[in-house]
Amino acid sequence: DCPSDWSSYEGHCYRVFKPPKDWADAERFCSQQAKGGHLVSIERFGREDFVSNLITKNLQRG
């Protein structure tokens, strides 16, 4: 189960954070948000679509 402000996909939890960070700062930040947390890695087309939609929704919210 994911926290209420996170999204679930294939047994993993995802969340878009703002403002943008460089890779090293973003990876460090993600590891502090949840045990085992990391920046998303796009390894399959389904995940790519999911992450793309998640980012688009968050950008539209402002």
Curated annotation (Swiss-Prot):
Keyword vocabulary terms for this entry: Disulfide bond, Hemostasis impairing toxin, Platelet aggregation activating toxin, Secreted, Toxin
What Gene3D superfamilies does this protein map onto?
Mannose-Binding Protein A, subunit A (3.10.100.10)
Which Cys pairs does UniProt list as disulfide-bonded? C2-C13
Location of this chain's protein in the cell = Secreted
C-type lectin domain location: 9-62
Membrane-spanning regions, if any?
Answer: none
Can you cite an annotated GO cellular component?
extracellular region
Tissue and organ distribution = Expressed by the venom gland.
State how it assembles: Heterodimer; disulfide-linked.
Name recorded for this polypeptide = Snaclec aspercetin subunit beta
Protein source organism? Bothrops asper (Terciopelo)
